Curated annotation (Swiss-Prot):
SUPFAM superfamilies: Class II aaRS and biotin synthetases, Nucleic acid-binding proteins. Its main location: cytoplasm. Binds 3 Mg(2+) ions per subunit. Its EC number is 6.1.1.6. This is Lysine--tRNA ligase. Mg(2+) 2 binds at residue 421. It comes from Neisseria meningitidis serogroup B (strain ATCC BAA-335 / MC58). GO terms for molecular function: ATP binding; lysine-tRNA ligase activity; magnesium ion binding; tRNA binding.
């Protein structure tokens, strides 16, 4: 807004004084009229006006007198003699308003001059361009639609306090265009994933959020109580077992995008409630699921970024090339070539090496569990470009189908990008007797103190006994996918209202 001379700012008052002053203004408005009218009808968005008229020259645009009605939050306001300029912001962007006593009455102008930054206004008028070429609405009528009682963050400093950003996301969205764009992209990513699944002839379904038995993943659940039934219920840690029941029922391709809950720690990549997609396909296997995961992620990147070659934290990530595939042991040796096969199959050596890398020993320290723990300590964080880690041990994969050719391993994968897990999938175990034995082994682990071990789910076994077709399944963390595709460094930046300690 180069025409303006001096921006209008709040008096040099503290926040409480500013709020008190604004409340007084609101009281005065209430004495005269409805302070919160709801009859202004907007017909234009800022971005649409810029797209349609932004390239038209002043000489061509001004004589047309194109009428518009716009509405939004006042972000800038400046007076220049008998005229005033303001910038309002709607969901699509910003547009400038111009008021003078030729377009509106002096009473309206005086009223406008008492309004504050953050107020929500509706204006009508005609489009023109300033001498500096800025598309502007020459206002013929303007109304205050909602009074802002609290001051916005400083225009130049923005909302810099991270905790305030997360606690008061509404202020963050007002003040920070980058945050708004991140959450717009999040919505586009989810829509891209949904469209892709529908294009693959999958049926979107909804399964329970409260489970009588927690299952579908190894994690600690949140527990609640149903008063009428007088039973404990568990917020779901994964929808897997219900989705596979649907495959038993003949819904051969199903997916669900929804929340899951895990009563675990919080970090830059963990929030107690999170969004994921899980999908299952009959007459499929983990090879098909790996290709599906690869295609979903690549397609989402192209949709929101226009390319599958992106940058994360200043470093390139190649989502375009076929994703690499390694076993757990291959990944360990890739980054630690001095390790020998003998060492990697020695339980005592593995335990010492795990501790050396700062990892905790697994609750059930079989060779497979120990190898996985070492992988997490010495290799996982180095997997920058997308890499499928395949063929997980049976003991850490209680729902995955055992390999026909590799003793003690399963047809399971996890996908890692920028050093963190993004997806998990496998050929589903569809032998009910084998599944029952694995559930029993999980119960033994739980009795030994492993809070994350699974319960025995008798109804799921009953469903399997009707016959689960050969099936592939996969889960992808939506929050982590959004982090990757928006170059966000913490999960809190991509969840609108992340879990916080109470104030």
């Amino acid at each position: 807004m180069s025409e303006q001379n001096h921006p209008q700012t709040e008096p040099q008052l503290d926040e409480n004084q500013i709020i008190a002053l604004r409340r007084e203004k609101l009281h005065n408005i209430r004495q005269q009229r409805n302070a919160y009218p709801n009859d202004f009808k907007r017909d234009s968005f800022a971005a649409d006006l810029h797209a349609q008229y932004g390239e038209i020259g002043k000489e061509e645009l001004d004589p047309q007198g194109i009428p518009v009605k716009v509405a939004g939050r006042m972000m800038l306001k400046r007076q220049m003699g008998k005229a005033s300029f303001a910038t309002i912001q709607d969901v699509s962007g910003q547009i400038q308003l111009y008021l003078n006593n030729k377009g509106v009455s002096q009473e309206v102008l005086d009223d406008f001059n008492h309004w504050d930054l953050g107020d929500i206004v509706g204006a009508e008028g005609t489009l023109f361009k300033t001498n500096h070429g800025e598309l502007t609405v020459r206002v013929s009528g303007i109304r205050l639609l909602s009074k802002s009682l609290r001051p916005l963050p400083d225009k130049h400093k923005g909302l810099s306090d991270q905790e305030t950003k997360y606690r008061q996301r509404y202020v963050d969205l007002i003040a920070n265009e980058e945050s708004r764009n991140t959450f717009i992209k999040r919505s586009q990513i989810i829509q891209s994933v949904r469209n892709f699944m529908v294009g693959e002839h999958y049926l979107e379904v909804e399964t329970p959020m409260m489970h009588p038995i927690p299952g579908g993943a190894t994690a600690k659940p949140f527990v609640t109580h149903h008063n009428a039934l007088d039973i404990p219920l568990y917020l779901r840690i994964a929808p897997e077992l219900y989705l596979k029941r649907l495959v038993v029922g003949g819904l051969e391709r199903v997916f669900e995008i929804n929340r899951s809950f895990r009563n675990e720690g919080m970090s830059v990549r963990h929030n107690p409630e999170f969004t994921m997609i899980e999908f299952y396909e009959a007459f499929s296997d983990y090879e098909r699921m790996m290709q599906m995961a690869e295609d979903i992620i690549r397609n989402a990147s192209r949709t929101v970024n226009g390319t599958a070659n992106i940058t994360y934290n200043g470093k390139e990530v190649d989502l375009e090339s076929p994703f690499e595939r390694l076993t757990i042991l291959e990944a360990i040796k890739k980054y630690n070539p001095h390790y020998t096969d003998e060492q990697l199959n020695d339980a005592e050596w593995l335990k010492k090496e795990i501790v050396k890398h700062g990892e905790s020993l697994p609750p059930s320290p079989g060779i497979g569990s120990l190898q996985l723990a070492l992988f997490e300590g010495c290799a996982e964080g180095k997997l920058w470009n997308p890499t499928f880690i395949v063929d997980y041990p049976v003991e850490v994969s209680p729902l995955a189908r055992a390999s026909d050719t590799k003793q003690g391993l399963t047809e399971r994968f996890e996908l890692f990008v920028v050093g963190r897990e993004l997806a998990n999938g496998y050929s589903e175990l569809n032998d009910p007797e084998d599944q029952a034995e694995r559930f029993k082994a999980q119960v033994v682990q739980k009795d030994a103190g492993d809070d994350e071990a699974m319960h025995y789910d008798a109804d799921y076994i009953r469903a399997m006994e009707f016959g689960l077709p050969p099936t592939g399944g996969c889960g992808i963390g939506i929050d982590r996918l959004v982090m990757l595709l928006t170059d966000s460094q913490t999960i809190r930046d991509v969840i609108l209202f992340p879990q916080m300690r109470p104030e």
